[in-house]
Amino acid sequence: MIKLKVLLLTLMVSASVNGQVVISEIMQSNIDCIMDDMNEFPDSWVEIYNGTSASINLSEYRLGESDDASEAWKLPDLRVNAGQYVVIYCDKEATGMHADFRLESGKNCEVHLFRGDAVIDCITGLKKQPAPNIAYGRMMKAEGLLSDQWTYFCSPTPGKANVAEAAEDILGEPVFDVDGGVYETKRNVKLTLSIPAGSPLGTHIRYTTDGTEPTADSKLYSTPITVSTPGVVRAKLFCKGWM
């Protein structure tokens, strides 16, 4: 009897996601991950998945930052086939596939999907996006169906199934041995690791000295950095499977 109840619950959860139109992936800060139909990089975006067995018209739906349907952006007149993904650019352009709002990259970002005045899916209480070009989306099940479990993706898949490697854990931040500020003389800036409890081995620091966001290809930190000219040192922790 217990096994039967668990099976029924699993099927009900699957139906709740894959039998409806849902939000499947978002990006709060898009620097250069995806280019829109205007050949520009939208500030943020939301991916919607048609999990029903029939085509839908997006004009029956709205997308917004609160649970107030009257303030939500009406989606354009576009037919979306069953099993198809579509990306809405959130950049305040308010035309075509471009919504009249942008997602907040800080804490407590919300996204609500409406059909008529009813909320049919939503994401609330989001944390600050760990870094630009990081997506937050539903994980895929082994059978190729979307799940109710959300995670971060270092390799976003706008307009496609979320098959990229998930990064469920977020690393801390490196600690400088001096406070931020302007210094007139040369000095060493020593970076030390600040690793969350339970982090795996292999965590390392990469940094830049031109103010840009460190990436996996940035210089690997191994010894104190000497800043000899005006510049901005930025550092970030990296570890496979983490962000």
Predicted feature locations:
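Activation on beta-sandwich/Ig-like modules and their edge loops
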Residues: 18-147, 217
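Sec-dependent N-terminal signal peptides
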Residues: 4-15
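Generic alpha-helical hydrophobic packing signal
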Residues: 4, 47, 61, 185-189, ...
